[in-house]
Amino acid sequence: MASYFALVLNGISMVFSQGLFPLYTIPDHLGPWTPIDLSHLHCPNNLYTDASYCTTEQSITYTELKVGSSVSQKIPGFTCTGVRTESVTYTNFVGYVTTTFKKKHFPPKSRDCREAYERKKAGDPRYEESLAHPYPDNSWLRTVTTTKDSWVIIEPSVVELDIYTSALYSPLFKDGTCSKSRTYSPYCPTNHDFTIWMPESENIRSACNLFSTSRGKLVRNRTSTCGIIDERGLFRSVKGACKISICGRQGIRLVDGTWMSFRYSEYLPVCSPSQLINTHDIKVDELENAIVLDLIRRREECLDTLETILMSGSVSHRRLSHFRKLVPGSGKAYSYINGTLMESDAHYIKVENWSEVIPHKGCLMVGGKCYEPVNDVYFNGIIRDSNNQILIPEMQSSLLREHVDLLKANIVPFRHPMLLRSFTSDTEEDIVEFVNPHLQDTQKLVSDMDLGLSDWKRYLLIGSLAVGGVVAILFIGTCCLRCRAGRNRRTIRSNHRSLSHDVVFHKDKDKVITSWESYKGQTAQ
């Protein structure tokens, strides 16, 4: 099955070079019709082949691209941004601690980014802890600054690898490209001065693991090499081939766009810039696989139909539709006319719209003109009904185009936040928007009173302060009582002194007596 996958992909390479898989194929001209027997029916060869008259064969080992490989290789990676968080604490006299957090950038190193990515990938809690604020230290009546470095990993970040030049392309990079070709642990600077891009795999050359080794036969004539028969038995001519390197490996590009690498000593020109393998068009592997699966399904249906025809000995118009060639090129056309199975040589061309085949009612366009049926029978199962409507079986089952439309509609790539805006110049003090969702918010914290003591010391201090307060209250109260008692004694003494010096008036005479002694003397008289 894998070999047939590769064979079919090689066969439709020319079709892809011209565009998507065709909606339908129809002959642009038909040869004369010839009666054939049922045993002459055969399923079409939907592969590109070439004829050669060379006879000398030599077994060789060659290298080819893996099935589904594309010139535009997707390299999964991640971005790493250096963020330094500072916590500034100040403890005042009574123990209040004020903490302020500040963030700024620093240029990260690839080694540290790789370690942070491995921790995040493994679910190591140390990565999440590194994004948290640093545990702030404090000292009484001092300002303490604590710093903590974080490496913010954002993934996925997918870039494109050019297998011709090994350059990386992405809008993340400065000038859109990164040409560093280091083998181990490479990194690329980005539009942000403090962010670098790194691949998920340390060895970026592993992304060029596009090759597979096969065995085939080198076909030669007496003078030169004619081509190579690959392991699937398909002859590949070297006529029109040119030299081209893929991921540093020298090889040749065949005329149909196939790349091979084998020992070839004859002269070949270097491929021009327009002669690239599959060009630079991005082809989704799922799209190619769906088309290949549909081709294989149709070939199996054709073989089943052929087996049914041979065993039953009967054929119908519907069954003849399975023998139509699905890709442009030379093939056969079949019809069932007047009870006779007919065959004609035909050259098929692609059809992208049904209007190209049926421009108006009753007209089947072949070779630029309306093809005349025989008894309302055309070829390859196409007939005309009584209402002059042309019926094509594949118009009801165009699965190939449905695959294309569905796959294109369902591809939603991840958009790295750096792609949403451009970053040209940033300072260390500015934290860019795409990093903020991964970090804690900067904030200012004020703690409760804390003298930096343990619990028992804190309780001892509180008890000592309480006892000291009681003693102070008692002392102040005692002092107040003593002061009041002393004040009262001084008041009494002053009153006694004032009485001894008071002036006495005699009631009989208006004579002033200046003292008690003089009063006693006067009364004695």
From Swiss-Prot:
Intravirion side: 481-525
Organism superkingdom: Viruses
Keyword field: Glycoprotein, Lipoprotein, Membrane, Palmitate, Signal, Transmembrane, Transmembrane helix, Viral envelope protein, Virion
One GO location term (cellular component): virion membrane
Biotech utility: Primary surface antigen capable of inducing and reacting with virus-neutralizing antibodies. Almost all human and veterinary vaccines are based on the functional aspects of the G protein.
Keyword hit for Glycoprotein: yes
Transmembrane segment boundaries: 460-480
Keyword Transcription regulation listed: no
Note: Its mutation dramatically attenuates the virus.
Protein name: Glycoprotein
The species this protein was found in: West Caucasian bat virus (WCBV)
Gene name tied to this protein: G
